[in-house]
């Protein structure tokens, strides 16, 4: 039995979400391999090789997978699945984009946003905005699974996996990367932050939000969060939104 984990990264560093997905994959059982697909992502592959419990890292370098678009990743991953029982993907924007296409090409049901692995066929995932837990059983021979990283501890970094090179899909593909606008911040990334300070509509204005929430977050070296109502009212930008329609968080300290 073997599991393929698709690494979340920016071609420069390995996102901690990958470590958490490795923990979930280990609960599934069997050997765990990591796929690092990107352009100039050698450092990412080296970091992935150090993740505990990983057998090997498959490093695919090429312009076609630089941004891990769904078409290119499907063309890469689907042929690889002959050697794997499941593919585990972080439930991030990138992961949620590629997983449905991979599942469709494999003709299997995607298992989304899981929070626990019961056995090789049975998984848990939240429903009704997290107010209930659904147990899902799949009879598909191949599993395509997105993982809610906040539900799992991060794997350690005492591994020494081998790194193997593989070819990138040639393309061309119908979709292509045009541009991206990244929000730059010195704060921790909200979804993975250990400390979060969050504000809601009761603060009354953007000025009060900035006066009360931001300085406290600075003191605690925390990420800043906001409720949907606060975001809709213009107190905070969309990328601060926490909850069902925003970022899922599981910090050690949450102040609201």
Residue positions per predicted region:
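N-terminal glycine-rich FAD/FM-binding segment characteristic of electron-transfer flavoproteins
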Residues: 1-256
């Amino acid at each position: 039995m073997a599991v393929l984990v698709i690494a979340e990264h920016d071609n420069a560093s390995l996102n901690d979400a990958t470590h958490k997905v490795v923990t979930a994959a280990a609960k599934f059982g069997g050997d765990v391999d990591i796929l690092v697909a990107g352009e100039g992502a050698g450092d990412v592959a080296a970091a992935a090789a150090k993740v505990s419990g990983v057998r090997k890292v498959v490093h695919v370098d090429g312009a076609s997978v630089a941004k891990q678009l769904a078409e290119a990743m499907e063309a890469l991953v689907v042929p690889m699945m002959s050697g794997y029982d499941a593919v585990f993907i972080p439930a991030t924007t990138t992961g949620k984009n590629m997983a449905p296409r991979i599942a469709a090409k494999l003709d299997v049901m995607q298992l989304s946003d899981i929070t626990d692995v019961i056995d090789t066929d049975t998984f848990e995932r939240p429903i009704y905005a997290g107010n209930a837990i659904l147990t899902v059983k799949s009879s598909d021979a191949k599993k395509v699974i997105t993982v809610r990283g906040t539900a799992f501890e991060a794997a350690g970094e005492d591994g020494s996996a081998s790194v193997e090179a593989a070819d990138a899909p040639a393309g061309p593909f119908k979709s292509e990367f045009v541009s991206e606008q990244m929000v730059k911040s010195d704060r921790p990334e909200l979804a993975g932050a250990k400390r979060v300070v969050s504000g809601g509509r009761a603060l009354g204005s953007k000025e009060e939000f900035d006066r009360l929430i931001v300085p406290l977050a600075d003191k605690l070296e925390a990420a800043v969060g906001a409720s949907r109502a606060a975001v809709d009212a213009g107190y905070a930008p969309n990328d601060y939104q926490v909850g069902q329609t925003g970022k899922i968080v599981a910090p050690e300290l949450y102040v609201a």
